[in-house]
Amino acid sequence: FDRIRVSDYEPAFDAAIAVSRAEIDAIVNNPAKPTFNNTIVALDRQGRLLSRVEGIFFNLLEADATPEMQQVAENVQPKLTALSNDISLNPQLFERVKAVYEHPGWFLSKEDKKLLEETYNGFVRSGANLSDEDKELYRQYSTELSELSLRFSHNVLAATNAFTINITDPAQVAELPDFVRDGMAAEAKARGEQGWTVTLQAPSYVPFMEYSTNRELKEKLWRASNSLCLGGEFDNTENIKRMVNLRLKIANLLGYPTYADYVLADRMAENAQTVNAFLGELLARTKEYAVKDYNTIGEYARSQGFEGEVMPWDMAYYSEKYRHEKYELNEELVKPYLQLDSVKRGVFLLANKLYGLNFT
């Protein structure tokens, strides 16, 4: 991966998309009668080069979303959405899929039948059966939704990265475990700051909330984390409203009353009513235990000299202390066993035992 430059990604996407389009054209223009192999299997195998490029890029984007990587994502996302729509809304291609679906033959295995069913349903759920007018609406809605989803994610990341608290008083970090303090010092150094810096990123936020006794700073962190993208420069309110509206329009176009019903139609739950019933039952069965756990932590906090109401930003600290005292669980003692090299060895060993794979 160290040989890949950011400037390599967009040309790689363009080349892989071109290959995918050529593969689709070959299926559509095949003069032979549609069969499971020349249509369904061919569809399943197309796009593998693009999948490799997407897998590398989007995994690295999640891990290290630099402004340059985000710009690449903004540039390629419309192209990926256009390709997806051009495939699912291609009438000639769908006719071939439909022909195989309606006359599959007796020789298909269970796995083949599953692939055929999922391929056909995937086209239908992506607008293949819509009228030409509705197909154009579907294309517009899905394109805008894709752009909004990317903007939403970028705002969340930008807002998360924008909020930090820098501490220069050694007394305010003296109580923290070494691994927390060292991480904060490294963060400060990376930002060109003095002292120690805590951010909203989980590796920084979570241990600070668990080990710091500074309630004022923890309240600021908690409120910032729980109001992310609510107002300000990175506000996502209008994006969310528009995304919800577009999802409803897509669901209605495809014959579903809600987007939840559309998503659940090919899943075990099947519809929103089933999920709502499950959630209602889950709430009824678990609320008592959640309240009990909350009260237990509150009582423990008061036994430690805490006065007043235990607030949300207090829970992580007293929960961690309670676990350590009652169950002798100490995260700091476990960390030496979870160094990167140790974890990699463990993962590779497990892969060898389960699947016979060897990594060199």
Language model segments and positions:
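Short, hydrophobic/aliphatic alpha-helical segments
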Residues: 236-248
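N-terminal helix-rich structural modules
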Residues: 1-176
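Active-site-adjacent "gating/activation" loops or surface patches in catalytic cores
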Residues: 190-228, 315
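Active-site-proximal, well-structured secondary-structure segments within enzyme catalytic domains
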Residues: 115-116, 139, 144-147, 154, ...
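Membrane-interfacial helix termini and the short, flexible loops that connect transmembrane helices
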Residues: 27-32, 60-65, 212, 220-221, ...
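Second-shell loop/turn segments in exported
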Residues: 2-10, 123-127, 204-211, 228-233, ...
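Amphipathic alpha-helical coiled-coil segments and their boundaries
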Residues: 36-39, 116, 123, 134, ...
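Membrane-entry segments of alpha-helical transmembrane domains in multi-pass membrane proteins
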Residues: 2-12, 36-40, 233-236, 275-282, ...
